[in-house]
Amino acid sequence: MNRYKISEEEVPYGILESFGLTREMVGDLPVDVLQAILSGRRSPILPIRVDDSEGNTIHARTRFSLVRREDGTVDVLFYPVLVESRLERFSEEQKQRLLEGKAVIAPMQDNNDNPAQAFHQIDSGTKQILSVPTPVIGRNLQIIADEFHLSHAEINCLQVGEPLTVAEGDDLMTIGIDLNEPTGILVCVGDGVQWKQEAKREWDKYNFGCFGCWVADGEGGLVYVHEDDYTEEMWNELKRSSQRRMQNANTPKM
């Protein structure tokens, strides 16, 4: 069984709904986002709400991911937005590099409570620390190094968390560690500035679905607006996007 590939029928909608994320809201996420979630990746930052034991409603912003338990069922992990990153276990130099968005290598505890070396990086959206064992990223780095014929000095540059720009024919390519990526490495066309822009995904302002629309909140996350609550601006944008789709569908392919 593939522990990381989850079918839509297995999604624990009941758990998500208890945190204010209805089946319709989840289904209205962009298709590429849904596919990523079903592959075990983390969601965008979304608003949730839950009632505590005293009946108070608590509102928060969080990412979530789907995980398969040992018994084969699927559960939900939440990654709430923190006020600030917890960096106590890192040196002052490592803290500075982490706050600059770079990856650092430092010990982490494995499942058997043994220290193991790992790459660490701050998720700028939630301020959570992302950690991946060094052998996993190291293997992927070696594949990239072979593909781009990187020197030992260039590989070392990547290992210490610095993006590397190389010439590939007539193009510039920039490579760097980004633990938000499935492979832990982001490769893009362009220089370091373009790499940073690529690493920080910007959502379209309006992401329309069947029942409502996910709207970019300006802070790297999304908020949901039901169709009944669309503003005039949203209706106009929906009309324009529908017209664009019709024009694209009617454009003859070369």
Where are these regions (language model features)?
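Beta-strand-dominated lipid-handling architectures at cellular/organellar boundaries
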Residues: 47, 58-65, 70-92, 100, ...
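Short, flexible beta-strand-to-coil junctions
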Residues: 49-54, 65-71, 109-113, 122-126, ...
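Short, flexible domain-boundary/linker segments around small modular repeats
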Residues: 20-50, 81-112, 147-158
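Solvent-exposed loop and beta-edge segments used for protein-protein assembly and interaction
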Residues: 38-42, 54-58, 70, 112-114, ...
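Charged, compositionally biased non-catalytic regions
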Residues: 1-35, 59-83
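A eukaryote-biased signal for long
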Residues: 15, 19-23, 121-254
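Short small/polar-residue motifs
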Residues: 32, 58-65, 113-119, 161, ...
